[in-house]
Amino acid sequence: IKQLLGAGGQGEVYSVESGHKAYALKWYYKNTATRNQKEILDNLIQSGPPDASFLWPQDMIFRDYGESFGYIMPLRPQNYRSIVDMMKRKAEPSFYCLCKAAYHLTKGYHALHGKGYSYRDISFGNVFFDPDTGDVLICDNDNVSYNGAKTGIYGTPRFMAPEIVTGKAKPSRNTDLFSLAVLLFY
């Protein structure tokens, strides 16, 4: 383990090195390291990423049976910036690169939906882009599950479809499209 990269409600993310190769490790807090979460991750690892824009789980990491667990994924290159960086003018892509980023983002989610999955939590915090090329990387893919599956992930306020907020629907490919539209036109 090299350093802590960040922490959230489910766990902490570290940069790690194995065999002279860098990865990111998400380690779940004990209360979020559930059997359901492990089953979701096992499925995602087995199915593989929808396309190259996803920082997809690659392998599970365990301490001891019954203990907390985590997974490794590719480490985001430093030249990729968050959408919040762009809004704060810490990254200033050209209009052409913004259009390419929007294209790559929609193409990535289309590939995800084509595999029968929904993302469930599209928001500023889960997308990074290269301001020089418009390439995108989608992270936090442990939210992903089969379309219509019951999980505890409903989305991020301001990005959630109205039917989720009112309790009339669960997250799905269709509600992902609403969240994606909010993200693209924010």
Give short role names for the model-derived ranges:
Residues D176:
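Conserved catalytic-loop aspartate of Hanks-type protein kinases
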Residues Y109, H113-P131:
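Catalytic-loop of the protein kinase fold
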Residues L55-A101:
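Conserved structural core of kinase catalytic domains
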Residues L180-Y186:
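Short, conserved alpha-helix in the C-lobe of eukaryotic-like protein kinase catalytic domains
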Residues Y29-P50:
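The N-lobe alphaC helix and its flanking beta3-alphaC-beta4 segment of protein kinase-like domains
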Residues K150-G167:
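Conserved activation segment of eukaryotic-like protein kinases, specifically the C-terminal portion
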Residues C139-S145:
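Activation of the activation-loop gatekeeper triad in protein kinase-fold domains
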Residues I1-H20:
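ATP-binding glycine-rich phosphate-binding loop
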